[in-house]
Amino acid sequence: MIHILKGPFEKASRPLVDLLIRHHYTAFHLTMIAFFGTLLASILIYYQNWIIGSSLFMFFSLFDALDGSLARRNNSAKPIGAFFDSVMDRFSDSAILFAIIFYAFNTGKRNIFLLALLALIASLITSYIKAKAENFLEFGSIGLLQRPERVLIIFLMLLFPNYLLLGLWVLVIGGYITICQRLYSAYQKFNPQSFS
């Protein structure tokens, strides 16, 4: 859903991207800044510093969204860059959800612990399905909760921790719906090939 805003976001962020290019930042720099920023946010979340932690998480997630735009803007986009960015995104997603898992474990909140664990699995499997399918065919952006949607939900539930359980339910249900959507789409795309 949110991915349809990619074009307008890229256009609106162009002045900032140009500024970063003038100061010799590369897509790799932005990817690493976003990753370490998310690690910092995860530590703050673990210690229940919800407002600062969630704000930093969203800030660095938006920062991460600029790396592809910057690479395209200065004609430095390469497959290795997209690959590395995808890997670091998985580390970032895992870090923030692990922060919630450890917070729940230490505070004895079993429901939050279990749901955060299920949300982490859903996030990783969702990404894995696309990565694996794209080894064989063009897959595209498919599913109810892709990464931008997950980032927004995580930000909101961390900013308003009283709704943490609700946010995790949304992540879990939406995540497994997305897995089913991607599996079904992959089956449809693979099936004609199996009879060729």
Which sequence ranges carry the predicted segments?
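N-terminal membrane topogenic signal
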Residues: P8, H24-H29
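Helix-loop junctions at the membrane-solvent interface of multi-pass transporters
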Residues: H24, L44-Q48, A99, L159-F160
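Ser/Thr-centric signal marking residues that sit
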Residues: F28-T31, T178
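Membrane-embedded alpha-helical segments that form the functional core of polytopic membrane enzymes
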Residues: T31-I80, R110-I121, Y163-G174
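Membrane-interface alpha-helices at helix entry/exit sites of multi-pass transporters
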Residues: G81-S86
